[in-house]
Amino acid sequence: MISSFTSLGSRPLLLSSGIAVTAAAAVYFSTGSRLANEALHNKTFKGFKGPASTWVDLPLVKFEDLSHDTRKFTFKLPNDDDVSGISPLSFLLARPHGTWSLRGIRPYTPVSLPETQGVIEFVIKHVPNGGMSSHMFSLKPNDTVSFTGPIVKYEWKQNKFDSVTLLGAGSGITPLYQLMGSILSNPEDKTKINLFYANKTSDDILLKKELDEFQQKFSDRVKIHYYLSQPKTKDIASTGAKKGFIAKEDIESLAPASNENTHVFVCGPEPFVKAYAGQQGPLFFQGSFGGILKELGYTKSQVFKV
């Protein structure tokens, strides 16, 4: 069975689920200690180490409203000391418990760290007329959802790059936040992070408290730039955001393509991705490269559309 994809250039490479998850856990948690990696793998919930045909039912513990259309959902793993073990830039597939319609299956990115014990968390936006997101927003504590995976979109390796630039919009922050958490929780990973995050108003900024804590705790390595296209009167002063969209000039001055050994990850609505990195391809294909990043001198090999 095929359950995981990992990037090889702009084309996906299919890996058997056991190899993919084991490799992903090793990549993320590599701290020079084989025993530490083995200990983590041994605690990883076995439901996230099986084939794609293996679906596991997890009960909802709680949910928290983050904005008018977005919630953080916390699901319980079977045992209190279980961990997800899911590597950065990976996601799970979810479907309503007891149903098998392919149209009801959706990918969701965990925002909890791989070593978080007992639970796994997701930030999910309610899409109008979206079957799965509507189902998620109808859940009550102790209701269950079926999950399978993980699917690895990009195989992250610690210290492969001196720095990464993250361009996100709206709920596209979730895989970028996942990557930030993975880097910053790994004492061996010294990668610097430059995040450009665009929204309409301050109320739409997801995980702002957590992002600001990253910047405060790792001020020498993390720089965050907020942009609001339709700010309210107090938004700019309260958030320190800039009015408008992520400016080409800001990327050029704060994250120039001339920086050696750097990489860019882009995630957001289709028009956002197209404007900055070119049209995204179907499924796991990267599609054409273009947009503002190409104009700034970045090459296709330096940019990944999450």
UniProtKB/Swiss-Prot annotation:
It comes from Vanderwaltozyma polyspora (strain ATCC 22028 / DSM 70294 / BCRC 21397 / CBS 2163 / NBRC 10782 / NRRL Y-8283 / UCD 57-17). Residues 53-157 form the FAD-binding FR-type domain. It comes from the Eukaryota. FAD binds at residues 160-195. GO terms for cellular component: mitochondrial outer membrane. PROSITE patterns: FAD_FR. The gene is MCR1B. This is NADH-cytochrome b5 reductase 2-B. It is a single-pass membrane protein.
